[in-house]
Swiss-Prot record:
Residue ranges of the region described as Catalytic subdomain A: 150-261
Its EC number(s): 2.4.1.41
Residues on Cytoplasmic side: 1-6
Main location: Golgi
GO CC term (a single one): Golgi apparatus
Species this protein is from: Rattus norvegicus
Keywords: Disulfide bond, Glycoprotein, Glycosyltransferase, Golgi apparatus, Lectin, Manganese, Membrane, Metal-binding, Notch signaling pathway, Phosphoprotein, Signal-anchor, Transferase, Transmembrane, Transmembrane helix
Gene: Galnt11
Topological domains annotated Lumenal: 30-608
Protein name per its UniProtKB record: Polypeptide N-acetylgalactosaminyltransferase 11
SS bonds (residue pairs): 141-373, 364-441, 493-512, 536-553, 578-596
Length: 608
């Protein structure tokens, strides 16, 4: 009897152990692993998955589900596994509500993104590493053909503390939209970044999900963009160097038009048209074809294209002479880059190098063109999110070197604006002066006469202004709705707290007066809300807790971009929140922003 009892006791222990083993297996495999990766699709890479497809031909599906190894979560990419589905409706990559905030974690990531990167990292992470962008080329570009013997390209991307998702979207756009036989390599130069995800995680990602032609070089100390690009170029072995910023997305057929011009003349440097990626919404939009210029403060500026450069049967697709380049995106024969003296290594970090190389190209026998059929999108930030390592004014230092080497007597134009800099140190320029002599370069007067005759000169060398530009002015956006912005529950209207013409003024709820034109809002195709046809409803992108204000319409979307969504909510695109009445029982009628929840405090209608 005792042996039977012991035997059944042992059976019970074995059964219990097996049961617990199965339960623990289910718990750990389906709770701890699957749950954080719930947005990883079974095939390919959906809009929310942290792991994109492996290197597959475009429009094909990727591998099966990836569970191991998981990348470590950290402060800069902790949204990569976040569920961003709207409770009411799934959000696609093209959704205007892709930046919607659902919880405090979303809000923290959005605010951190603006602080660290000066753009909306919440949306950037949700977009993933692959997305289609609109083909913004002129229709005539789409029928053009290019030689079959184009040179190969080394794409050099220098980055410092870049957002992980933005950097990888840059790289994937190049891989996805560049013929493999033309893309010799992509060289990523890490300029001693501080963020953890740009070190081991980036290396592991590249090894697992990108072709072997993608390489990373790591600077041991901060060198800056200028010397960082020189380091990348020194490692390159392709026939052409293509420099890109680390927050770009190349468009279709972007590389062939650049390479074709360089094949024809290796001493020609070419730039794509730089399309706009909004820092607030990451929406990709077309830019007009303009050319580079500068002012006597030695700052780059965009100019309209002279009438003389717009003629000809191929005017929509023909290369456009540009006195200067913006500097972030350009292509150049690698041997010519070295022969021409690369960059001035005495310049620090960033600033002025684009004008210096532009002057050197033109004055020393080369040419600089913008190619209308090549388009690359670039995130245009309103500020630089980081400074120089020791806080030095590198723009001034670099501009002084530029002025003393290349401007000849015209450097006095610069010093007339900055007399305080005449005695400021700028380092040893003897090598650059010797380079100019060795290359047999023209004078700066030759440059002004032959390349940039539109540039105005003050003093005894002043010239008459040449009215050679066409400026038709901006097209006014089409009006979609006109009426009063009515709050459904309080039966009141949103109006200016003071005068509707007061810039920076607050808005609040008051009794609707259908005879008062200052209560009338216009909603146009640019998604702007304009009160009394004067000022736009605007939100601070960096301080989402601030109330909305009336500001001058800037036409750039972002802080002034509003959409009417389901449940009558009024959604602010760059902030990712909805307009609400702060306290519906309070007679003061204050309004603010809050996480969109469809509550009665967030219900609005624009009606006549």
């Amino acid at each position: 009897m005792g042996s039977v009892t012991i035997r059944y006791f042992c059976y019970g222990c074995l059964f219990t152990s097996a049961t617990w083993t199965v339960l623990l297996f289910i718990y750990f495999n389906f709770s701890e692993v699957t749950q954080p990766l719930r947005n990883v699709p079974i095939k390919g890479s959906g809009p929310h998955g942290p792991f994109p497809k492996k290197f597959y031909p475009r429009f094909t599906r990727g591998p099966g589900r990836v569970l191991e190894p998981q990348f470590k979560a950290n402060r800069m990419d902790d949204l990569m596994n976040n569920n961003i589905e709207d409770p009411d409706k799934g959000l696609s990559k093209s959704s205007s509500e892709l930046g919607m905030i659902f919880n405090e974690r979303d809000q923290e990531l959005r605010d951190l993104g603006y602080q660290k990167h000066a753009f909306n990292m919440l949306i950037s992470n949700r977009l993933g590493y692959h997305r289609d962008v609109p083909d913004t080329r002129n229709a005539e570009c789409r029928g053009k053909s290019y030689p079959t013997d184009l040179p190969t390209a080394s794409v050099v991307i220098c980055f410092y503390n870049e957002a992980f998702s933005a950097l990888l979207r840059t790289v994937h756009s190049v891989v996805d939209r560049t013929p493999a036989h033309l893309l010799h390599e992509i060289i990523l130069v890490d300029d001693s970044s501080d963020f953890d995800d740009l070190k081991g995680e980036l290396d592991e990602y590249i090894q697992r999900y990108l072709p072997a032609k993608v390489k990373v070089i790591r600077n041991m100390k901060r060198e800056g963009l200028i010397r960082g690009r020189m380091i990348g170029a020194a490692h390159a072995t392709g026939e052409v160097l293509v420099f890109l910023d680390s927050h770009c997305e190349v468009n279709v057929m972007w590389l062939q038009p650049l390479l074709a011009i360089i094949l024809e003349d290796p001493h020609t440097v070419v730039c794509p048209v730089i399309d706009i990626i909004s820092a607030d919404t990451l929406a990709y939009s077309s830019s007009p074809v303009v050319r580079g210029g500068f002012n006597w403060g030695l700052h780059f500026k965009w100019d309209l294209v002279p009438v003389s450069d717009l003629g000809g049967a191929d005017s929509a697709t023909a290369p456009i002479r540009s006195p200067t380049m913006a500097g972030g995106l350009f292509a150049m024969n690698r041997q010519y880059f070295n022969d021409l003296g690369q960059y001035d290594s005495g310049m620090d970090i960033w600033g002025g190098e684009n004008l210096e190389i532009s002057f050197r190209i033109w004055m020393c026998g080369g040419k600089l063109f913008i190619i209308p059929c090549s388009r690359v999108g670039h995130i245009f930030r309103k500020r630089r999110p980081y400074g120089s390592p020791e806080g030095q004014d590198t723009m001034t230092h670099n501009s002084l070197r530029l002025a003393h080497v290349w401007l000849d007597e015209y450097k006095e134009q610069y010093f007339s604006l900055r007399p305080d800099l005449k005695t400021k140190s700028f380092g040893n320029i003897s090598e650059r002066v010797e380079l100019r002599k060795k290359l047999g370069c023209q004078s700066f007067k030759w440059y002004l006469d032959n390349v940039y005759p539109e540039m105005q000169v003050s003093g005894p060398k002043a010239r008459l202004q040449q009215p050679v530009f066409i400026n038709r002015g901006p097209k006014r956006p089409r009006v979609l709705l006109r009426g009063r912005l009515y709050h459904l529950q309080t039966n009141k209207c949103l109006v200016a707290q003071g005068r509707s013409s007061q810039k920076g003024g607050l808005v609040l709820l008051k009794a609707c007066d259908y005879g008062d034109p200052t209560q009338v809002w216009i909603y146009n195709e640019e998604h702007e809300l304009i009160l009394n046809n004067l000022l736009c409803l605007d939100m601070s992108e960096t301080r989402s807790s601030d109330p909305p204000r009336l500001m001058k319409c800037h036409g750039s979307g972002g802080s002034q971009q509003w959409t009417f969504g389901k449940n009558n909510r009024l959604y602010q695109v760059s902030v990712g929140q909805c307009l609400r009445v702060v306290d519906q029982m309070d007679q003061k009628g204050y309004v603010g922003m809050a996480i969109c929840d469809g509550s009665s405090s967030q219900q609005w209608r624009l009606e006549g």
